[in-house]
Each structure stands twice: as C-alpha cells, then as structure tokens.
Amino acid sequence: MTLWLVRHAQPLIEAGICYGALDVAADALATQTAAQNLASELPLGARLLYSPLQRCVQLQRALQVLRPDLACQMDARLVEMNFGSWEGQRWDAIARAELDAWTQEFATWRCGGAECVQDVMTRVAAVWDEYCGQQQPTVWLTHAGVIRASTLLAQGKRHIADASQWPQTAPAWGRWSALQN
C-alpha cells in the first residue's frame, strides 16, 4: 500500500508563533493550488483521512471538489501536537527553562502542560495500525508533526529516546511525500 502524507497549505499566522492544535486557517489560494497539484497525482478511489483542524479541512474540501472519487473521512488522531499553554504564544516568549526541559526530556515532556511527543507517536501509531495493512491507497491530510511521526513508524520505530531521533524535515506547506508499506 502507498500512504500519501500531505501537509496543509501555509497557515495564516505570524511567523514565530507556536501553533499545533491551535485551529488556524490556511491561505485560500495556496490551499487551492495544493489541491490542484495533488488531484492529478492521487490514484483513483484512494481513501482520504484528514485532520479536523480547519487548515486541513480546507484542503480536503478543495480536493473533494476536484476528486469526488476520493473516500473522505475525518480522523481526529491526525491533528498536530497540542502545545497547551504555549499555543498562540511567540516561541521566544516561552520560558527558556521550559524549552530546555522539553529538549532534555523530548519524548515525555508535556509541552505547555498538554501533549508530549510520545503521546503523538502513540496516537499516530493507532491510525497507522488501522489503515496501513490494507491494500487501498491511503492519503492523510495532516501536519508536519504527524508526518514526522509517520516517518519513524515507517522505520519500525514507535518510541524515541531523545530529540536527536526526531526527523528534522517534513514536506513543505501544500506538498506531500509517499511511503510504501
């Protein structure tokens, strides 16, 4: 099976602001462009799962107009990491001690009192386990953190020990990568 990991278009938020579970809209033109580019690439009848955050819903709706053959389903497990009290704050306004603690305990530190990276890994692994053994091509419209977690799952890694193991790259906004499973 092929798993398409698609990142939403560029969000309408000032650079340097922490947003994960914060429900920020994406640029409408960039979303439409991403949908047009993606529509011609996806196989017929693919299953499409998408995050309920509006930046992904926007892309799902634009893509569904172009590709009504896609079987679309919202899946809350595909949301970005919840940074709790950090959400909506400037990264440089978050206490240095908290950021250092996250780096030191990367897998288990609850950012802003909410999720930790291992929570995200576990949540994404549940979706992975449910769909990745099936033959139907599957598309996830999601976020960079979920895509990074998926990259680790594709390598057979369900837990990480420290920040050095977390993938540094993800597709650019409105772009995608495909994993063969």
Language-model segments: what does each one mean?
Residues 62-66, 130, 153-157:
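Active-site catalytic microenvironments for nucleophilic, acid-base chemistry
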